[in-house]
Swiss-Prot record:
Domain of life: Bacteria
Gene3D superfamilies listed in its UniProt record: 1.10.287.3240
UniProt xrefs under NCBIfam families: V_ATPase_subD
GO MF annotation terms: ATP binding; proton-transporting ATP synthase activity, rotational mechanism; proton-transporting ATPase activity, rotational mechanism
InterPro entries (alphabetical): V_ATPase_D
Region (Disordered): 203-223
Keyword field: ATP synthesis, Hydrogen ion transport, Ion transport, Transport
Job of this protein: Produces ATP from ADP in the presence of a proton gradient across the membrane.
Protein name, per record: V-type ATP synthase subunit D
Any one GO biological process: proton motive force-driven plasma membrane ATP synthesis
Amino acid sequence: MSQVSPTRMNLLQRRGQLRLAQKGVDLLKKKRDALVAEFFGLVREAMEARKALDQAAKEAYAALLLAQAFDGPEVVAGAALGVPPLEGVEAEVENVWGSKVPRLKATFPDGALLSPVGTPAYTLEASRAFRRYAEALIRVANTETRLKKIGEEIKKTTRRVNALEQVVIPGIRAQIRFIQQVLEQREREDTFRLKRIKGKIEAREAEEEGGRPNPQVEIGAGL
């Protein structure tokens, strides 16, 4: 506190800083509320995605067992070698209240994975089931990645709000009180000093007035 110079200029600056800090708290709280709403929306989406993934996994492996049983493991393995690989997974960045949140996007090959001509029915259905499984897996990865990132942003924003409310703003207010107290004390001292000076001046003037001869008495004496 002793490092703060108690001047009126610093008092004005600290008041401006206080207003900015309070405005910052309001904006950060709005951001946090928006992120929390987004977070809970993603929680529901993530639960649905997980449920869909479990179902897709069951269907895919059931279709695989049927294909191996009816078409033969060698046919299924040979067909799997002809399936084009996933072209890639990209992470697009979205701006959510100033926070960069990734969105995963997978690019699957166009058209059917296997040609219906010459591919046994059960093997063909297994390839379709595993594509649905891959799509469900990407959806889960996307929602859970976004969920994790938004959760981190909520924690970061909460820490910033707490720092402003519990450290920065109280510190600025304490500095304002200190400067005000010093300025008020100086004002009282200046007022007291001025009163003393004024009193001395008035006393000196009274003494000088009392020591002067009365003009009317001098005129009467001359007559």
